[in-house]
C-alpha cells in the first residue's frame, strides 16, 4: 500500500510502498480517507534533535486522520464495517497506576501512533479498537481529521473554569487558535491571543477572539487597558513554548490566576518564581487528550455550534504531500489536510 515514511535518518519524508498492516484480535483496520499534518510531523520532516532521539527509521508516520472501518479483529465489539472513525494516538499500557485509575492520558508507558509505531499517513492503519472513536454523522471528515490537535485545544481550554473570565492565550498556532474559539464558545469574557505571525493572528480574528495582539508591535498592557481590565487575566493558556511569552503571561496574570501549559519550552527556562508564589498562581501541565472525555466534548462542542472551520486553510491530494509540508513549515497556514481517496 501507499504510505509516507521516514525512510532515512535525514531531513525529508518519502512516499513508499509498504505491506498492508495486519488486523489483530482486538484491532480495527481503518481505511484512511483524510490526514492532517501536525507540528510533530514537521519536526520529523526536519529531523531535529527530538526526532533523532525518538523516531525509529524506517517507519510510516502521521497521527491525525479520519477513515472507515475496513476490518475488525474477532475480539472487537461496538464497531461495524463502514463506521467512520478517528482515533486516539496515545496507546496506553493498561496496567500502570494511572491507567488502572482511569487516567489513561497520564500513562507512563505511552506509545505514539506515527511516533513509536507505524502511523496513519498510509492507505490503512491498524489500531486497537479501544483507541478508536466512532464519529457522529454531523461531524465532517475535514473536522474529524483534526480531532487530535482539536483535542489538545479542548483539553487545555477546559482545564479551568472559563465562564465570565478573562483569558490570555500565548501562541497563535492552530491549537492555540482552536483553544481561543473554545474559550469564547463556553463563555469567557475577553479572549486575548498573542503571537508575532500576522497570518495566524488574522486566523484568530476570524475565530472570534476579542483581540489578537502582535507583541512585536503592540503592548499587551495597552490592550488590557483598552478592554477595561484592572486586575489581570484570570486564566492563561500557554501554547507557544516561547520563554518570553510565558514570562509575559506570568506578569499579566491576576492574583489567584490559573495557567494551563501545553507549549513545550526549551530546557532550563528561567521562571520568575516571585510571580508564581506571591500571586498564588496555579500551573497545570497538559498532555494529549483525556481518554475519552475530551473526545466526547469535542463532538458535543461542534454539535452545539462551535465553528473551527477557518483553521482548515489548505487541502490537497496525498501526492502533493511535499507542498503540504512546505506550506506548514512556511507558517502561512492553519491546518493542512491531505486527501487519500
Swiss-Prot record:
The organism sits in which domain of life? Bacteria
Query: What is the UniProt remark on how the cofactor binds and its stoichiometry?
Result: Binds 2 Zn(2+) ions per subunit.
The entry's protein name is L-threonine 3-dehydrogenase
Which gene specifies this protein's sequence? tdh
One molecular function GO term is:
zinc ion binding
Catalysed reaction, written as an equation: L-threonine + NAD(+) = (2S)-2-amino-3-oxobutanoate + NADH + H(+)
The taxonomic lineage of its organism, from the top, reads: Bacteria, Pseudomonadati, Pseudomonadota, Gammaproteobacteria, Alteromonadales
Which PROSITE patterns does the record match to this protein? ADH_ZINC (PS00059)
Could you say which enzyme class this protein belongs to? oxidoreductase
Q: Which NCBIfam families match?
A: PRK05396.1, tdh
Q: Which residues bind Zn(2+) 2?
A: 93, 96, 99, 107
Amino acid at each position: 500500500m501507499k504510505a509516507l515514511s521516514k525512510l532515512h535518518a535525514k531531513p525529508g519524508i518519502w512516499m513508499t510502498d509498504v505491506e498492508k498492516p495486519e488486523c489483530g484480535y482486538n484491532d480495527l483496520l481503518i481505511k484512511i480517507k483524510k490526514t492532517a499534518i501536525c507540528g510533530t510531523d514537521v519536526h520529523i520532516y526536519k529531523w531535529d534533535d527530538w526526532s533523532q532521539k525518538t523516531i525509529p527509521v524506517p517507519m510510516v508516520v502521521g497521527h491525525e486522520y479520519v477513515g472507515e472501518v475496513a476490518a475488525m479483529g474477532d475480539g472487537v465489539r461496538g464497531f461495524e464495517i463502514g463506521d467512520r472513525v478517528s482515533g486516539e494516538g496515545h496507546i496506553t499500557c493498561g496496567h500502570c497506576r494511572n491507567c488502572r485509575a482511569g487516567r489513561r492520558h497520564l500513562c507512563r508507558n505511552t506509545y505514539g501512533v506515527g511516533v513509536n509505531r507505524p502511523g496513519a499517513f498510509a492507505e490503512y492503519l491498524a489500531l486497537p479498537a479501544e483507541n478508536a472513536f466512532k464519529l457522529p454523522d454531523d461531524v465532517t471528515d475535514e473536522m474529524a481529521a483534526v480531532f487530535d490537535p482539536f483535542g489538545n485545544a479542548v483539553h487545555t481550554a477546559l482545564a479551568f473554569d472559563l465562564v465570565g473570565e478573562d483569558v490570555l492565550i500565548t501562541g497563535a498556532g492552530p491549537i492555540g487558535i482552536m483553544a481561543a474559539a473554545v474559550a469564547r464558545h463556553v463563555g469567557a469574557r475577553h479572549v486575548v491571543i498573542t503571537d508575532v505571525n500576522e497570518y495566524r493572528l488574522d486566523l484568530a480574528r476570524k475565530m472570534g477572539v476579542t483581540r489578537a495582539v502582535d507583541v512585536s508591535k503592540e503592548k499587551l498592557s495597552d490592550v488590557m487597558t483598552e478592554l477595561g481590565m484592572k486586575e489581570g487575566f484570570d486564566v492563561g493558556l500557554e501554547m507557544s513554548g516561547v520563554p518570553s511569552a510565558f514570562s509575559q503571561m506570568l506578569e499579566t496574570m491576576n492574583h489567584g490566576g490559573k495557567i494551563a501549559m501545553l507549549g513545550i519550552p526549551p530546557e532550563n527556562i528561567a521562571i520568575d518564581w516571585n510571580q508564581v508564589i506571591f500571586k498564588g498562581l496555579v500551573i497545570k501541565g497538559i498532555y494529549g487528550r483525556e481518554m475519552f472525555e475530551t473526545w466526547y466534548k469535542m463532538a458535543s462542542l461542534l454539535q452545539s455550534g462551535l465553528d473551527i472551520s477557518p483553521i482548515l486553510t489548505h487541502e490537497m491530494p496525498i501526492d502533493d504531500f511535499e507542498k503540504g509540508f512546505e506550506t506548514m513549515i512556511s507558517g502561512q497556514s492553519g491546518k493542512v489536510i491531505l486527501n487519500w481517496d
